[in-house]
Regions:
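Sec-dependent signal peptide recognition
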Residues: 1-8
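Hydrophobic h-region of N-terminal signal peptides that target proteins for export
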Residues: 9-17
Length: 311
């Protein structure tokens, strides 16, 4: 009898645990000395032309790891082509950028450096500038004996980004049986699964692990009311495959409730508006206001903490 129960518990207990499609966030291994150097570089405006902006100008860590605009301003106030995503929890993404053009965090660093709408510089110029700072160079060389290069600078920044994980979200604590969750948020989670948001937004980061077309059940771009821009082609710009047109990396939703603009084009500026658009264009559904609010409450419960955050 006891044996039977044990076998049952083993089978179904483990099935239940692994069947939950969202998992709690956890920290990942990283090197503290590299994290410290990476942090310095992340906030250093000398990485950009004329010392105008740093990574942190667009990825504001005190809020949600992005800025509160639809399009970020790079050097000389130039506006970017897409909305800045958060850097928090980005280590869990299968690829970086909306179209996945960077294979990992380290590869991503070159994009803002060379982008004329972001840092508008080059590695040789940037390295020459930093090499003049004797104190920084000494500290850097103690950790990276080969000194400053695109490889070592990118590595340090990527290490810092690996440390940007938001822990102890109310939802995670509830999943682990360590905290309670409001009825409304629980209902939101149920709807999130029931309607199929979970088919795309899943795993630790509630997204970030696959690509999907924007507008599965409707012509999102046709209805948007603004002309299609090159960035709207998404993953197609990287692969050239017809099937990848209008396809984007499914964004992680861990900090979605903190955002003020949504989607790659920053076209939506309310959370319930974004959920409504998703229901309509990705699932062919029309949700009630109460359902939208329940899902918003669930998304709010996904917001964890990090020491860089002030709220
Ligand atoms: C001028 C604003 C701006 C600056 C400066 C900037 N970024 Fe970004 N960042 C963006 C935008 C916009 C995107 C989206 C780009 C795309 O998808 O093509 C992005 C994407 C990213 C991503 C991918 C996140 C994801 O979920 O795909 C990471 C990581 C990142 N930036 C880190 C950095 C780092 C590190 C620096 C400094 C070396 C930096 N950014 C500088 C605006 C900026
Ligand atoms: C078919 C896959 C798919 C489904 C189903 C889906 N999404 Fe999305 N979601 C995406 C993609 C892809 C994007 C990015 C689209 C873009 O930027 O143009 C996105 C973006 C979002 C955003 C904006 C995040 C940001 O950083 O701007 C929110 C919020 C969101 N989804 C919530 C939901 C909710 C809630 C549901 C269920 C009602 C849902 N999604 C269903 C694929 C999906």
């Amino acid at each position: 009898m006891i044996l039977k129960f044990l076998i049952w518990a083993l089978l179904f207990g483990s099935v239940w645990v692994s069947a939950e499609p969202i998992l709690p966030l956890h920290s990942v291994a990283t090197d503290a000395r590299k994290v410290a150097l990476g942090r310095q570089l992340f906030f250093d405006t000398r990485l950009s032309r004329n010392n105008e902006v740093s990574c942190a100008s667009c990825h504001q860590l005190t809020t949600h790891g992005a800025d509160n605009t639809a399009r970020s301003k790079g050097v000389a106030g130039r506006l970017g082509d897409v909305k800045a995503p958060t850097v928090y929890n980005s280590v869990f993404n299968i690829r970086q950028a909306w179209d996945g053009k960077a294979v990992d965090l380290k590869a991503q660093v070159t994009l803002p450096v060379e982008n004329p709408k972001e840092f508008a510089t080059s590695w040789p110029v940037l390295i020459a500038t930093l090499n003049k700072d004797k104190a920084f160079l000494d500290a850097f060389t103690q950790v990276y004996k080969d000194g400053l290069s695109s490889d070592t600078i990118s590595d340090a920044i990527a290490h810092y980004e690996r440390s940007l994980i938001t822990l102890n979200a109310p939802f995670d604590l509830w999943l682990q049986g360590k905290g309670s969750l409001s009825e409304q948020a629980q209902e939101g989670y149920r709807l999130f699964k029931y309607y199929g948001c979970i088919n795309c937004h899943q795993g630790k980061n509630v997204g970030g692990n696959m690509f999907a077309k924007m507008g599965t059940f409707g012509d999102y771009f046709g209805d948007r009311g603004t002309p299609i821009e090159p960035a709207d082609y998404g993953r197609y710009n990287v692969t050239g495959r017809e099937a990848d047109k209008f396809t984007f990396k499914v964004p992680g939703l861990r900090l979605a409730a903190r955002q003020t603009f949504f989607f790659h084009d920053g076209s939506e500026h309310s959370l319930t508006g974004a959920i409504n658009t998703m229901a309509r264009y990705q699932l062919g559904r029309s949700l009630s206001q109460a359902e939208l609010e329940a899902i918003a409450a669930f998304l709010e419960s996904l917001v964890g903490q990090h020491q860089e955050m002030t709220q």
